Amino acid sequence: MISVSGVTKHFDEVHALDYSDLDIATGEFVTIVGPSGCGKSTLLRIIAGLINPTEGSVKKPDESMGAFVFQDAALLPWRNVQKNAELLMELEDGFSKHERVSRISSALQQVGLEGFEKSYPHQLSGGMKMRLSLARSLVLNPDYLLLDEPLSAVDELTRELLQEEIHTLWKKENFTAILVTHNVSEAVFLSNRVVVMSPRPGHIIHMVDVPFKKRDQTLRSNPKFTKIVNEISGKLRT
């Protein structure tokens, strides 16, 4: 379990987060939504350990491995697909050459990039770049994956396809996932639970359980799906 307790964050004069509490069970997919500037990305970065809270704490399982997928794919243009996927492994000790090759091959296959190992970022579409960013995190076999609006820069059709692929990966690999997005439909499609935050200083004002077992294109036209999307959208407008 990941446990967020009383987390508050100030940036100089800006009060970004206000006493946020959140428990996320192992293997759960939780999405955080809220108005722009409410602190949802700040909360995600605090959970990741990239920044420290002003007050409060985050507890994660001992020796658990996490990975972060940013909004910008942040690929190195002089490295090909295989070498970009290897980047995080170079920062960690203990990986043999054989294990690196095996993990990279598996991760690229999982995200549909097999056959593109020698391609460079400028040769990839926006969707392929995001797949590579995801593969770069998957090579670590993370216990939890934190995703900060990773699909915001791709077109709608690609976005929906990637949502299905992310959900399939999560089901297969059984990692804990925490996503930040502005897209309520995306939040409902991917998640077990959606967390709604208030305007800044952000705090959690509402949570919605999402009951659907099957996640495919047909779900988007399900009246129950639309009802949950509307419920969350209504909370964001209040």
Show where each model-derived region lies.
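Helix-to-loop junction immediately C-terminal to a conserved catalytic motif
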Residues: 48
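Conserved signature/switch motifs of ABC ATPase nucleotide-binding domains
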Residues: 119-122, 140
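Hydrophobic anchor residue at the start of the ABC signature
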Residues: 134
